[in-house]
Each structure stands twice: as C-alpha cells, then as structure tokens.
Amino acid sequence: MHGWAIMAALDTSRSLDDTSFLVFRSTPSRSMHYMCLSLNESDKIRLINAPSDVVKVVHDAIQTYYTYGIQRFENYGSVPEFKLNGSPWGGGENYSKHGRQLLMLLMDCLVKLGFGFAISADVSAKYHSDSDNSSAQYKIDVHSWWFARPIS
C-alpha cells in the first residue's frame, strides 16, 4: 500500500460518537487491492471498492447460506448494498447466530478469492438515542472489515 501497512485499529474511548484510529508502519511499497466489507445498521452489508467477482460471490453466498435471505440488493451511492431480512447484527439471538455464521462464510469466500484479512475497525460515529432522552443509546453501525489482495 504505497509504503504503509496497517498495524492496528485502536479504540481508546467508550464514547458513542468516537471511532477507532488506525496505526500504520512504513514498509516497502507493494501493489495491493483493498476493499471493505462494511456492516451497517442492523441488517446491511456494503462492499466498498469491491471488484465485480467479489460482489457476485457475496451475493450468491448470502442467497445460498443466509437462512433469512436478501430483502433488497441495490447501490448505496456507488457501493453495492445488501439489505438482509432480520437483524443479523442488531438483535435477537437467532438472527445474530445466523449473522455471525454468514460473516465467517463471507470471510472464507474472500480468502478463496485471494484476499487476506487486513483489519477490523469502528469507523462510524453514528449512534441511536431515544427521543425521550432516556439512557438508551447505542452505536448504529458495527465494525467494518478491510481485506487486501496483491494486484497481479
């Protein structure tokens, strides 16, 4: 990555509106393709900077292996977005169990396409706050995962 490699994503605050900060180290330059699997709200997957082969494999894997299926597939701006049925990263033990299983499967699919896991980080400062000013506050988005593969 142009002479820099990611070392860590650090969370140094419990504040809801804070994000991870990324630590890099200097390395010899290497041509890599980076993409992000971004988990949004309680039921969305966005594939940022993902090549078309990845989008197809992810789509097929979700349709085949995620019990509750895809509610909608469309672009969010220029980014492919899958809105899943249920709340795989937001609620209910059953949905969460299937969501975790799906994420491990997607990670395996990306590895088979030559991608390596680079880092997981909280990069969204969005959070929900009840309108009645109660203490019910929680982050809307969970960690995003970055993957890299050499450009050949």
Which stretches of residues belong to each language-model region?
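Long compositionally biased, domain-poor regions of proteins
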Residues: 1, 5-10, 25-26, 64, ...
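Short, flexible beta-strand-to-coil junctions
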Residues: 12, 40, 49-53, 123, ...
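Short, structured interface segments
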Residues: 19-28
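A residue-level signal for beta-strand positions that form part of recognition/binding surfaces
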Residues: 21, 44, 144
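Surface-exposed interaction/gating patches
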Residues: 27-80
